[in-house]
């Protein structure tokens, strides 16, 4: 009996391998979607660190929103995946040469930005308000500058 308890404690502290694999797969799917060349070439999303972050925030928030309808297991997978996503952001900043002292501040800023974006997207989708979603995408993904075309509208239509 004690052996089972110890395993349960370690599983709760460190998570299971299956949980990690599921989160890895979901993050890979979100990342693949956010990196599709069509967003940058055809929809005018800036192919920059900020543009890539914004598409990760958009597609991550859509995936996590869908998982929110799946009860506790969905919430756990969403949190595990979000944790991995921010760990990947941390790694990316380090690979770009951001010093150890600057990483926590930048990741905290990214976290706040993600929360704001996810809340704006979720509110618009819950309300069924395509115009509000398009406005949030224009404000966040395109930094308020309309691309030459209908990229924000097309992204909003997909997200609805």
Language-model segments: what does each one mean?
Residues 1-160:
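Surface/interface-facing alpha-helical segments and adjacent flexible terminal/loop regions used
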């Amino acid at each position: 009996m004690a052996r089972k308890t110890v395993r349960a404690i370690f599983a709760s502290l460190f998570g299971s391998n299956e949980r990690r694999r599921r989160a890895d797969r979901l993050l890979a799917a979100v990342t693949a979607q956010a990196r599709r060349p069509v967003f940058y070439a055809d929809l005018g999303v800036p192919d920059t660190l900020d543009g890539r972050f914004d598409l990760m925030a958009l597609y991550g928030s859509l995936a996590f929103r869908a998982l929110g309808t799946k009860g506790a297991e969905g919430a756990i997978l969403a949190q595990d995946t979000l944790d991995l996503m921010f760990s990947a952001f941390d790694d990316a900043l380090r690979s770009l040469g951001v010093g150890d002292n600057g990483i926590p501040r930048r990741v905290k800023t990214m976290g706040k930005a993600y929360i704001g974006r996810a809340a704006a997207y979720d509110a618009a989708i819950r309300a069924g308000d395509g115009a509000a979603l398009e406005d949030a995408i224009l404000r966040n993904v395109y930094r308020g500058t309309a691309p030459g075309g209908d990229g924000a509208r097309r992204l909003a239509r997909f997200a609805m």
